[in-house]
Amino acid sequence: MQTEWNFDAVNSAQEIILKPGKYKLECWGARGGATGTPLSDGFYYGKGGYCSGELTLRKKTALYVYVGFDGKKGSQFNGAGYCGSATGGGATDIRLVDGNWDNPQGLLSRIIVAGGGGGTRDRYTAGSGGGLKGGIGRDFNGSPSHGGTQFEGGKGKYDDGSLDGSFGKGCAYPNPSAGSGSGGGWFGGAGGNGGSFGSGGGSGYVLTKDSYKPPGYTPTSEYYFDNVVMTTGGNTTVVGNYSDGRAKITLLQALPFLTVSSYNSTQATFKVDHTDPTLLTKIEYFIDDVLKETITTDLTTEKTINYTLEDNALHTLKIVVTDSNNATAEKVLSISKNIMPLPEDVNLNDISTKLIEVNAGFKTGKTSII
């Protein structure tokens, strides 16, 4: 069974469908590009950021992976600010909605992002990608070109905002033969102005209970991460003189899951599965918390169970599936059986009598509603 998936930079979304389970998701942003005359120890381009977290999926889930390119390749994919060989690095992210990388609904569905590094010219320092926030780029006077943050794009040198980063997008000086481009990210960094200038890095992001959710953000609490790590400049991998982004998903724990397709007052139909079906051990079902049957064979085939319920009562059906690690999945269903069956000529006294009967049923143990 496959437990690890790796994603390299390509110019489109990469889809993966994951079964329920506990996973570690990791993203590395791409390095910024550099051009001109470097110092003796090389260009001061911004490195890509690194972000990771652990996510438990309770249902089969489609995720879409977008991996940014080294800015030296001059690609604007996934938010890099274009400026020739001094283009910023593209962000790397995993999201719930696919389409073009700059699709607004897609950007608002990102659950983890690693920022791209800023591009630079000559000997001037660019900011690395985030991490919690992108690093700062500098020009020959030391003036800053800020990195993206959790709440806004990096602020550039010009007061008119023309070099500022924005949500999911870096920025660049309008003339590709001058200035430099910033890194893409959760929020992009600020671009460098004309002449020799290092741009800001894009910020990273990991969805948690306390993380910022912008207006229109769509992922819910079922996608909250635990054990989060966010490192600015955390991508130090160089392959063939390029440092593209990359992503990795690792299965940490296989889990059972259960889908109920139909149920009524006499029977229920359901299907059990598992990230690793060989780990399944048993299925149990309960009526009003009383165990009715334990199933230990053919666990992944669709099952229909039959039961008899008392009239004029409210009942609970609970189905529990267990694996060899004692991990469980369960469904609790509410079922009523002939509650208050009344004749056509019913009157208020009849209704009152039936309500008294239901109340008596609760007192004798019929306390669950399904």
Language model features: what each stretch is:
Residues K271-L279, D323:
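Extracellular acidic, Ser/Thr/Pro-rich low-complexity tracts
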Residues S12-Q14, G21-Y23, N264-F270:
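Structural beta-strand segments of beta-rich domains
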Residues T281-Y285:
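Short beta-strand elements bearing conserved aromatic residues within extracellular beta-rich modules
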Residues A327-I339:
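Edge beta-strands of extracellular beta-sandwich domains
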Residues A254-S261:
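Proline-enriched interdomain boundary motifs that mark the N-terminal boundary
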Residues Y45-H146:
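Secretome/extracellular-domain signature
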Residues T56-K59, N306-L314:
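Surface-exposed, short loops/turns at beta-strand junctions within beta-sandwich domains
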Residues V67, V321-D323:
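Conserved structural position at the C-terminal beta-strand
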